[in-house]
Amino acid sequence: MNFLRMSELSLTDKVVLIREDLNVPIKAGKVASDARLQASLPTIKMALEKGAAVIVCSHLGRPTEGNPEAIYSLAPVADYLSDKLSAPVTLNSDYFTQGVAIEAGEVVLLENVRFNEGEKKNDAALAQKYADLCDVFVMDAFGTAHRAQASTEGVTQAMHKAGKTACAGPLLAAELDALSLALETPAQPMLAIVGGSKVSTKLEVLHSLAELCSQIIVGGGIANTFLAAQGHSVGASLYEADLLDTAREIMGKTEILLPEYVVVADKSDIDFADFTGSLQQASATIKSVDTIGENDMILDIAPDSAIKLAEAITKAKTILWNGPVGVFEVDAFGQGTQIVAEAVKNSQGFSIAGGGDTLAAIDKYQVADGVSYMSTGGGAFLEFVEGKVLPAVAALEINA
């Protein structure tokens, strides 16, 4: 990919605006999960080491534009960054009216960009205001690269029109390099693991991967649809009857690996208003896919079947993982995902994992050190796999 990289630039005494993805859960005024913040730190530190004055911006949650609600404030993130950088990080809420007073070696965090009217609509005037704050713009938020918004794509266009520099940060560049390696020039055989509740949400991903992969392991509700397409009864399990022909079409393109044995619970034991909570008390039973009863809900891949699937994983040279293969939040229905996770860890192939549930599973089963690359993106990860253009990245390429 042809774009400027922050690592290649001289930033001495430059005011640098870095768009990060700092959209993290906040509970009781504190950061509840810091994975995205940890991922942003190397970029901020690199800019400081290069002698820059660093302005950081991000969104948090989904506030109503023009209505700055305290629950969506980035104040807890500023506190977190201050602690991790061992230096004060000032939160600036009036950056357009008062400007940003900053010197080299300092860090200022702009208040939630989604408080600004026109952010989501990629308002050109708003994008220009961001560009006016800096000498160099750094797009480092892969998780929002699929959105053409004022602080992601519009600001790059504004920088270009003003004759200023816009570039990719180290995190964004690493994401794109890893995904390109996995999707454009993958070592074969390539295998994908695709989980989730519905085929419809991963339909384009499955079609794209079917062209690349020798084998695809499907799990969760997606697997139920493929099992039904093979003529198996799936009982009371979640599946999509209107996509059976689509599932068969995908099976005609590549080898879809399905379990022979699954873990089920009786539908009557499940409170759908408290799904995972009620599953804690439900009985888990292993059954052949040929003996699923009308009240059975398939909730995991049985261990023996998961071990067979793991054998395929260990033989792959490239592995792409998106989605758990069972309700791993409940231990009785998590063994399949655990076995798959450990197989990815122990594989000698290049592995890339993405999606919030996937990263949560990696964290739960402590296999991160065996995964070659973990993508911070959710929707952006899927859209890249689908072959779609990411607007914020395209703007960087055009203006390189």
UniProtKB/Swiss-Prot annotation:
The keyword Kinase applies. Substrate binds at residues 21-23, 36, 59-62, 114, 147. Keywords: ATP-binding, Cytoplasm, Glycolysis, Kinase, Nucleotide-binding, Transferase. It is found in: Cytoplasm. The keyword Ligase does not apply. It is an enzyme of class 2 (transferase). InterPro entries: Phosphoglycerate_kinase, Phosphoglycerate_kinase_CS, Phosphoglycerate_kinase_N, Phosphoglycerate_kinase_sf. Its EC number is 2.7.2.3. PROSITE patterns: PGLYCERATE_KINASE. Its main location: cytoplasm. One of its GO terms (biological process) is glycolytic process. One of its GO terms (molecular function) is ATP binding. GO terms for cellular component: cytosol. ATP binds at residues 202, 329, 355-358. Pathway: Carbohydrate degradation; glycolysis; pyruvate from D-glyceraldehyde 3-phosphate: step 2/5. It catalyses: (2R)-3-phosphoglycerate + ATP = (2R)-3-phospho-glyceroyl phosphate + ADP. Belongs to the phosphoglycerate kinase family. Monomer. This is Phosphoglycerate kinase. It comes from Psychrobacter cryohalolentis (strain ATCC BAA-1226 / DSM 17306 / VKM B-2378 / K5). The gene is pgk.
